[in-house]
């Protein structure tokens, strides 16, 4: 880059850098909030529906057939 181009861009450098951090912090804050809430969540209170042995063997066969 030429020295003239550096001089033209100089007034905007710090404003653009600050804008980058402000705009970039919004999705990072959303990801951080989501991650902390998901790690705190306790799934032990959700009941697991019972499954019969016949249905379990059927599902295992379907799974094994899908792997091959």
Swiss-Prot record:
<feature type="transmembrane region" description="Helical">
    <location>
        <begin position="12"/>
        <end position="34"/>
    </location>
</feature>
<dbReference type="Pfam" id="PF09813">
    <property type="entry name" value="Coa3_cc"/>
</dbReference>
<feature type="topological domain" description="Mitochondrial intermembrane">
    <location>
        <begin position="35"/>
        <end position="68"/>
    </location>
</feature>
<keyword id="KW-0472">Membrane</keyword>
<keyword id="KW-1133">Transmembrane helix</keyword>
<dbReference type="InterPro" id="IPR041752">
    <property type="entry name" value="Coa3"/>
</dbReference>
<comment type="function">
    <text>Required for assembly of cytochrome c oxidase (complex IV).</text>
</comment>
<dbReference type="InterPro" id="IPR018628">
    <property type="entry name" value="Coa3_cc"/>
</dbReference>
<keyword id="KW-0999">Mitochondrion inner membrane</keyword>
<dbReference type="GO" id="GO:0033617">
    <property type="term" value="P:mitochondrial cytochrome c oxidase assembly"/>
</dbReference>
<dbReference type="GO" id="GO:0005743">
    <property type="term" value="C:mitochondrial inner membrane"/>
</dbReference>
<feature type="topological domain" description="Mitochondrial matrix">
    <location>
        <begin position="1"/>
        <end position="11"/>
    </location>
</feature>
<protein>
    <recommendedName>
        <fullName>Cytochrome c oxidase assembly factor 3, mitochondrial</fullName>
    </recommendedName>
</protein>
<comment type="subunit">
    <text>Component of 250-400 kDa complexes called cytochrome oxidase assembly intermediates or COA complexes.</text>
</comment>
<keyword id="KW-0496">Mitochondrion</keyword>
<keyword id="KW-0812">Transmembrane</keyword>
<comment type="similarity">
    <text>Belongs to the COA3 family.</text>
</comment>
């Amino acid at each position: 880059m030429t020295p003239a181009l550096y001089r033209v861009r100089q007034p905007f450098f710090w404003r653009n850098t600050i804008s980058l951090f402000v705009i970039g912090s919004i999705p990072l804050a959303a990801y951080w909030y989501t991650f902390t809430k998901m790690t705190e969540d306790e799934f032990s209170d959700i009941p697991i529906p019972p499954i019969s042995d016949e249905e379990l063997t059927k599902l295992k066969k379907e799974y094994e057939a899908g792997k091959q």
